[in-house]
């Protein structure tokens, strides 16, 4: 079936993978519902958002200029099976659900990134 529009939040509640252009609203909704993302940015803030999704281990980004059905299929299957992405999403969702007062979701994402970066830097240092 092809639809001109769908109730995105209702669909996200049932989705295993979310293919998105990478707008901040869509990413935020995917984080709330712990849905792994494939971000295919087109303009504006979308490329930066896509890079952050991938850097934080919340999904993968793809280039619409080189996208084809085979690469999309492979990426969907990869993201769907990636337990690390699912664990990262669960951590972010937990932080979001516990946000209160002065500590909003944006600060929690920054905190998650700092923790991820520290862990990643430690992993890199251990292998050298």
Positions of predicted regions on the chain:
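Short acidic (Asp/Glu) and glycine-rich catalytic loops that position anionic groups and cofactors
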Residues: 32-33, 54-56, 84-88
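Short, hinge-like loop/turn segments at secondary-structure boundaries
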Residues: 38, 55-57, 80
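Phosphate-coordinating loops and pocket residues in cytosolic domains that bind phosphorylated ligands
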Residues: 13, 55, 91
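A donor-sugar binding/catalytic signature common to diverse glycosyltransferases
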Residues: 3-51
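Charged/polar positions on well-ordered alpha helices
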Residues: 32, 51-52, 91, 107
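C-terminal amphipathic helix plus adjacent low-complexity
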Residues: 69-128
């Amino acid at each position: 079936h092809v639809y001109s529009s769908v109730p995105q939040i209702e669909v996200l509640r049932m989705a295993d993978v979310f293919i998105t252009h990478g707008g901040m609203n869509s990413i935020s909704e995917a984080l709330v519902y712990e849905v792994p993302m494939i971000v295919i940015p087109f303009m504006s803030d979308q490329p930066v958002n896509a890079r952050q999704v991938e850097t934080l281990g919340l999904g993968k980004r793809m280039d619409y200029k080189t996208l084809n059905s085979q690469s999309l299929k492979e990426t969907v299957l990869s993201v769907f099976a990636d337990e690390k992405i699912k664990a990262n999403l669960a951590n972010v969702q937990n932080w979001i659900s516990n946000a209160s007062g002065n500590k909003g979701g944006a600060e929690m994402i920054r905190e998650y990134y700092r923790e991820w970066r520290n862990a990643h830097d430690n992993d890199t240092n251990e292998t050298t």
